[in-house]
Regions:
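Positively charged n-region of N-terminal signal peptides that target proteins for export
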Residues: 1-6
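Bacterial N-terminal signal peptides
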Residues: 8-18
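Extracellular ligand-binding/catalytic regions of CAZymes and related secreted enzymes
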Residues: 22-34, 52-53, 63-64, 92, ...
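Catalytic beta-strand/loop cores that center a nucleophilic Ser/Cys/Thr
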Residues: 24-25, 62, 68, 82-85, ...
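Helical hinge/lid and interdomain linker segments adjacent to catalytic or ligand-binding clefts
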Residues: 27-28, 38-42, 46-137
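Hydrophobic/aromatic beta-strand patches that form the interior of the parallel beta-sheet core
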Residues: 40, 128, 222-224, 268-270
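Short, solvent-exposed loop/turn segments at secondary-structure junctions
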Residues: 46-47, 107, 134-136, 205, ...
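A glycine-rich, often tryptophan-bearing local segment used as a flexible ligand/cofactor-contacting loop or short
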Residues: 93, 102, 107-198
Length: 389
């Protein structure tokens, strides 16, 4: 009886460990800058494919530079990756993190899961954030409602985005779209005043497919990047002269934790970050350099630091609603894994409202259009939702 009970307990423990491992993704490096260092990536946005950006960067930092990288995703009820998912198992990995890479949009999680993030900031951990991280929470209730991007209480005005990164989604005092998203790409270059900053070593020009944001950096920020809106989605010299150059990224040396305490910690923010943006070598280089600088290892940054892609990387078209479905964290495990799997199905095409939004997305992405037309020809047929596109 005792043996049976013991075996049952051991089996339950093994199952629990396996379950936890299946819900997060870990890339373990062996040697390099990051030996003995742990970077945790939070990947949970609705649109810009943080679930692709984060693993791609994590692979580079682990394989090329020796870091241990843990990627935590929003998941659905079946354990598949879901942008904007309200369940993020594995947040306890933040307990021993040396650096946080934060890529989220409008999250709404359990108090327990948010608590691990709050604890990280209360101990003054460094952080790199991209794109929508300035508006990482929305609809959070109760204990952590102050983290919401639109929080107006004096105790944490502007929520996590404004207090940690220095901006929130607000046209007057924070960020807003600048140019036509999904239609106009942008050219991002180093700010002239920061040419000698270690993060910018080797960075010359980034083509970003994600549309520009107009940001208002906080007073204590060091400007790092400028952005010029293009009239084209793909890289070109066709500059939109109606849109003057604005800021696209900065660093700062402190933030306000949720308790209200000022923490001396390095912060880097960049307003690009869609997975398609990582097709730019300098786009990857800036973010890899940012992680190394934020962690305090800037003496290891080199002009020719290896930022080459690990494995196969085929980024998805960013959009809100239609994306690859059924992919689980372990599908992305291993150096040779593909981000994202070639056999992943396109989800969301049964929702007419989501399909309608695809029109301007597929216009600039002929390969995606061809795949959808092959698998769902009725959408392009006469009377179909994508007729004429």
């Amino acid at each position: 009886m005792k043996i049976t009970t013991l075996l049952a307990a051991v089996s339950a423990t093994i199952l629990l460990i396996w379950s936890a491992a299946a819900e997060t993704l870990v890339y373990q490096g062996t040697r390099g800058i990051g030996t003995g260092k742990h970077i945790v990536f939070i990947a949970n946005d609705h649109e810009y494919r943080s679930e692709e950006t984060c693993p791609a960067l994590a692979k580079i930092l682990a394989k090329r530079h020796g870091f241990r990288c843990t990627v935590i995703f929003g998941l659905d009820e079946n354990g598949a990756i879901k942008g904007g998912g309200r369940n993020m198992p594995g947040m306890e990995a933040l307990k021993d993190a040396d650096l946080l890479f934060f890529y989220a949009r409008f999250m709404n999680l359990t108090d327990e899961q948010v608590g691990f993030l709050v604890d990280y900031f209360e101990r003054g951990g460094p952080v790199v954030g991209v794109r929508t991280s300035t508006h990482g929470f929305n609809g959070q209730k109760g204990k952590w409602a102050k983290l919401n991007y639109n929080y107006t209480g004096d105790d944490y005005f502007g929520g996590l985005g404004e207090q940690i990164f220095g901006n929130t989604w607000h046209k007057e005092r924070g960020q807003s779209h600048y140019g036509s998203n999904h239609v106009m790409g942008c050219r991002i270059t180093p700010d002239a005043t920061a040419a000698a900053h270690p993060i910018l070593m080797g960075v010359e020009s980034i083509h970003a497919y994600s549309g520009a944001y107009k940001s208002q950096p906080p007073a204590d920020a060091t400007p790092l990047l400028d952005v010029q809106v293009l009239n084209t989605f793909h890289a070109s010299d066709d500059l939109n002269t109606d849109k003057p150059v604005v800021n696209a990224g900065w660093s700062r040396d402190s933030y306000i934790a949720p308790s209200g305490a000022k923490k001396n910690a390095r912060v880097v923010y960049a307003s690009y970050g869609a997975s398609e943006d990582l097709l730019s070598e300098d786009g990857r280089r800036f973010l890899i350099n940012a992680c190394i600088w934020a962690g305090g290892w800037e003496n290891k940054i080199k002009q020719n630091l290896n930022v080459s892609i690990v494995g196969k990387f085929t980024p998805s078209a960013y959009n809100n609603g239609v994306g690859l479905a059924g992919v689980k964290p372990l599908d992305l495990a291993g150096w040779n894994s593909q981000i994202m799997p070639a056999n992943a199905e396109i989800g969301g095409l049964s929702d007419p409202e989501k399909v309608k939004k695809l029109a301007r997305v597929i216009k600039n992405r002929p390969e995606l259009r061809a795949r959808i037309a092959t698998e769902y020809p009725e959408l392009f047929a006469k009377g179909g939702l994508l007729e004429g596109f």
